[in-house]
Amino acid sequence: MTISPPESGEKDKKILESPVKADPRPIDFAKLDKPGFWSSKLSKGPKTTTWIWNLHADAHDFDIHTGDAEEATRKIFSAHFGHLAVIFIWMSAAFFHGARFSNYSGWLADPTHVKPGAQQVWAIVGQEMLNGDLGANYNGIQISSGVFHMWRAWGITNESELMALAIGAVVMAALMLHAGIFHYHKAAPKMEWFQNIESMLNHHIAGLVGLGSLAWAGHCIHIGAPTAALLDAIDAGTPLVINGKEIATIADMPMPHQLCDPQIIAQIFPGLASGTGNFFSLNWLAFSDFLTFKGGLNPVTGSLWMTDVSHHHLAFGVIAIIGGHMYRTNYGIGHSMKEILDSQQGDPILFPAPKGHQGLFEFMAESRHAQLSVNLAMLGSLSILISHHMYAMPPYPYIATDYMTVLGLFTHHMWIGGLFIVGAGAHAGIAMVRDYDPAKHIDNVLDRILKARDALISHLNWVCMWLGFHSFGLYIHNDTMRALGRPQDMFSDSAIQLQPIFAQWVQSIQASAVGTSILAGTAEALPHKAISEVFNGSLVEVGGKVAIAPIPLGTADLMIHHIHAFQIHVTVLILLKGVLYARSSRLIPDKASLGFRFPCDGPGRGGTCQVSSWDHVFLGLFWMYNCLSIVIFHFSWKMQSDVWGLTGGNFSQSAITINGWLRDFLWAQSSQVLTSYGSAISMYGLMFLGAHFIWAFSLMFLFSGRGYWQELFESIVWAHNKLKVAPTIQPRALSITQGRAVGVTHFLVGGIATTWAFFHARLFGLG
């Protein structure tokens, strides 16, 4: 890829003087009528059916459109605004539906008895069957997205506020679309601007993250927390009094702007009306009524305290603003990322790399795929972390007792995390093929890792085999012993125990730490319940349902956790092998010249198929899917058994055999989806069936040979020619890579939608 040369007379200018180029690409609407205008080959139009596949495969591969790194980077930057516009439109739709069609007000008035509903379905051919009784005289479709709980935490108390948000989100979408067009066609940033790493870190960390968190803290403090205090008091049956008036219902609530009146807010949080004098005199304890550190859950709502959440966002915002100013920008002070990396030499004994991290800054700064890979890996890991917060630290009021929402959000964030991490492997492979220059990386950390790849992959392979045989072997042993009627010889909590002693130790030290530490700057100890209740804490009940409870761990957990470890390591093995061998291998030394995706290394070279970096991503997706399926199955059954009290605590004895998983989880819990016809959850029965078909359809692509299809097409074309109705676009069988792409897509979509229907029907069916 080439990099545009600097324009004449601009080499000596500072970046801030001329960061953009005016009118680099005038808007040409004529291009939009020509599919594939960015490719001389595709713009000629279709001659065979392969054209449509190449159009989709290459439309967003900006690298190959012009070969100019600056142009590709501008397209990425512009596409970000387009992405934000789509997000705002999606948010607007959610707000609008909440305002016009949902039962938000009814749910808000009685969240422990009324279920969240999206809309009422019109009766066209019997769809009114789907309108279930959600309480408070509302019949509609039950939802599990958690938006109602989130809106209550924000401080939204009526549909008018939702409609205002819907309008605001549409306006923001229009602004984002305009920004995307403007920053590509009218004022496009130059490459030097994109490469100004320290300024970018300053802007992203201090500006977007820091100020964003601080602004959100402001909303939580002035609107969210006061509204939550009033609503919690109503729900607890002890309404607050404002200006002599009892706030007994939502209709009595002050308007949002009234909560900013010092006279009104002083009656909810006196510290909030005390003015800024306490801030500048460092008397910050005056603010401890609305910036709290209570820990644990609000017993009324079963969620984190809104005042704790406010405190968290304020602290995080301040930390990010300070952290974002660590880097050297215009004033010659602070850290230089290049200097930091170049000075890192690595461990001289464990990992000797004479040139250390030299060259790493340039590679990361110039390779968009390398940047994206790191960001996807981190964001994917963060998404998986968020999954666990859904049950360990429920963030929104009443969400913890809406079991399908907890399970749905856990599952959703798991899938997102898994897809992002596989994406990290994909873009790392592309970076190695397209952006990595071996001549620039001699004896540095990247070079040393590539030289050690055989040791890395062979050891990882050994770990996978060890984990796989041993963890699966425990289940095989238990199934055999149970079949032979020898329960005393099984691995279980009542026979041969395999207790997760390290996990239990972590739980106990978390619980024992409460009340032993001193808060910084005060003489107060950490309050009780300063950690999650799942770590040997206490049970919190809301509306007669368990919101959170200690999660005991035993032999069944140790066994399934080792299955998790096995599957995670196999997924990592596949993805890492795809990256480390992306450019070359013993089998194909010139793999880099074949590109990121190729079917085989030509005829006569047996064993060279399915070795491209793309094929590793393809295989990694299957293992990611298998891995996370077991994770969400484990979570679903464990919570139903040991926390929510829905399956009589059968996890510890049933989950120790394969037969137990098949019989007591999959079969027993699928009764709701299999018997859903004729009820309000019948759509999940149809989805369960249809998604199985989509999944099975994928096998036709994954197991097929191209020759069969091409031969079939030829005979069909012959028949059309005989009838003189032959198409002008010649049919072509899918390439090996295209077939695999279609196969894995339907496999994942079918599998995920099947699980979606299974989970929803189960928990909605139980009520």
Swiss-Prot record:
PROSITE patterns: PHOTOSYSTEM_I_PSAAB. GO terms for molecular function: 4 iron, 4 sulfur cluster binding; chlorophyll binding; electron transfer activity; magnesium ion binding; oxidoreductase activity. It catalyses: reduced [plastocyanin] + hnu + oxidized [2Fe-2S]-[ferredoxin] = oxidized [plastocyanin] + reduced [2Fe-2S]-[ferredoxin]. Divinyl chlorophyll a binds at M700, Y708. It is a multi-pass membrane protein. It is an enzyme of class 1 (oxidoreductase). It is found in: Cellular thylakoid membrane. Induction: Transcription decreases slightly upon iron starvation. The chain crosses the membrane at residues 76-99, 162-185, 201-225, 309-327, 368-391, 407-433, 455-477, 558-576, 616-637, 681-703, 741-761. The keyword Nuclease does not apply. Divinylchlorophyll a' binds at H692. PSI electron transfer chain: 5 divinyl chlorophyll a, 1 divinyl chlorophyll a', 2 phylloquinones and 3 4Fe-4S clusters. PSI core antenna: 90 divinyl chlorophyll a, 22 carotenoids, 3 phospholipids and 1 galactolipid. P700 is a divinyl chlorophyll a/divinyl chlorophyll a' dimer, A0 is one or more divinyl chlorophyll a, A1 is one or both phylloquinones and FX is a shared 4Fe-4S iron-sulfur center. Its EC number is 1.97.1.12. [4Fe-4S] cluster binds at C600, C609. Residues 8-22 have a biased composition (Basic and acidic residues). GO terms for cellular component: photosystem I; plasma membrane-derived thylakoid membrane. Keywords: 4Fe-4S, Chlorophyll, Chromophore, Electron transport, Iron, Iron-sulfur, Magnesium, Membrane, Metal-binding, Oxidoreductase, Photosynthesis, Photosystem I, Thylakoid, Transmembrane, Transmembrane helix, Transport. PsaA and PsaB bind P700, the primary electron donor of photosystem I (PSI), as well as the electron acceptors A0, A1 and FX. PSI is a plastocyanin/cytochrome c6-ferredoxin oxidoreductase, converting photonic excitation into a charge separation, which transfers an electron from the donor P700 chlorophyll pair to the spectroscopically characterized acceptors A0, A1, FX, FA and FB in turn. Oxidized P700 is reduced on the lumenal side of the thylakoid membrane by plastocyanin or cytochrome c6. The PsaA/B heterodimer binds the P700 divinyl chlorophyll special pair and subsequent electron acceptors. PSI consists of a core antenna complex that captures photons, and an electron transfer chain that converts photonic excitation into a charge separation. The cyanobacterial PSI reaction center is composed of one copy each of PsaA,B,C,D,E,F,I,J,K,L,M and X, and forms trimeric complexes. Belongs to the PsaA/PsaB family. This is Photosystem I P700 chlorophyll a apoprotein A1. It comes from Prochlorococcus marinus subsp. pastoris (strain CCMP1986 / NIES-2087 / MED4). The lineage of its organism: Bacteria, Bacillati, Cyanobacteriota, Cyanophyceae, Synechococcales.
